Amino acid sequence: MSSATEAHVRTLSNGQEIPLLALGMWQVPDGPTAENAVRWALELGYRHIDTAQVYGNETSVGRALAQSGVPRDQLFVTTKFNPSRKDPAAELARNLQRLGLEYVDLYLIHWPQRGPTWAWPGMEHALELGYTRSIGLSNFSVNELDQLLTLSSVPPMVNQVQFSPLAYRRALLEASQARGIVVEAYSPLGTGRNQFASNPAHCRI
């Protein structure tokens, strides 16, 4: 990574560094739109690309990464387990095929469907197999975090949640920090539905 990129990272509990800024691929159509989004982001200096099985664009993301010329060790790739499926490790193996990668840097449970704990052993297994460098969660509450932590051999490194000035979840942030879990925000500037851009204070910032 460049010195500018290295200055904008957080260190996870396992020592891995995660770039603070990522390109999120939610609602980006598969095909040329997704490929161009990734390509242009990498040209602008982004090194963290965040996708998911349910986004349906992993193949295009992988194609753009392969064509970018950016060395793999300078990229940080996140994907997510769809908890309507059964086996996190097997699903990640399929994700890797679509992405054209040997591993991802971060693998998250996309949401706590069917309870917060059942999928975690499979996430730990994916880590043991070398399919991912780090594992974590998305959209988990404090109570769900604590249920999982009582049963986990490897604690989650990340909890990715909606977090913005209009959705400032202080209790979740403080509880996660106390447990050594990095909170990663999606929609950090809000979404079109919450009229973030119409707030004068936000516009001044």
Explain the meaning of each model-derived region.
Residues P112-I205:
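Beta/alpha (TIM)-barrel catalytic core signal, keyed to glycine-rich beta->alpha loops juxtaposed to Asp/Glu
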Residues A7, V38, E58, G62-L65, ...:
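Generic structural signal for well-ordered alpha-helices
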